[in-house]
Amino acid sequence: GTNLFDVLDVKLGRQYIFAGTGKGTLDGLNLKVKAGKYKEYQLSVYGGALAPYTYEFKKYPEIKNNYHFGAQFYYYGVKDLSAALSYSNKKRTPEPYDALRIDSAYNLVERTITFDGPAEQLAGIDLNYTYLIKHNFFGRAYYDFTQKKLYRAEANLRVTLPNNLRIFAEYVYREPHFTYNSIFWVFSYNKNQEVSGGA
C-alpha cells in the first residue's frame, strides 16, 4: 500500500531495491516511514531473500545463504538539499556443483564443490544541493566494511555564470567491486581516478 495512515508505504513480494549502497532484486518486504511536517524525514527498511538469477521459484536457495537487508535514511529539511545515509547487508552463496578432481593417489574422483564466505556489508552517503536553481553540487562516498576499503567516491560541481555560461568540475574515484566468491578476484586490477572539467 502507498501512503498508509499518511506516513507509511509498504511493498511486499518481488521487487528491485535501489537504496544507495543497497541494490538488487529480492523477494521480501520494503517499508518506508515518512515523518516531519513536510515529510522531510524518510526511512526505508527492507529485507528478504535474493531472487534467483533465473527469476524462477524452482530450487529456491536457502534464505540463510542468500539474503539482502538494509536501510536508507533520507533528509529533505533544507530547501533544495537532499541527503541520504544507507546500509546494505547482502549474502549470495553460489550453488554447489559436482566436478571431477584428482586425489592424492592420482585417481579421478567426483567431488562436490561448495562455497561459503562472509556477507557483504556496505555503507554510503549521498548529497545533492541546488542553489538558486542554477548551481548544483552532488557528492557520494561508498565504503565496504567486509573488505575494509572505500570503493567509490564522487564529487560534481556545476555553476552558472553571467551570460548563461556554465562550468563544471568533477572528480570520480572507483575500485572494482566484486562479491566474495567472484572469479574476477583472480585477475589483477587497478584503482581508477578521474578529474574532469569544462564549460
Language-model features: locations:
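Gram-negative and organellar
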Residues: 1-199
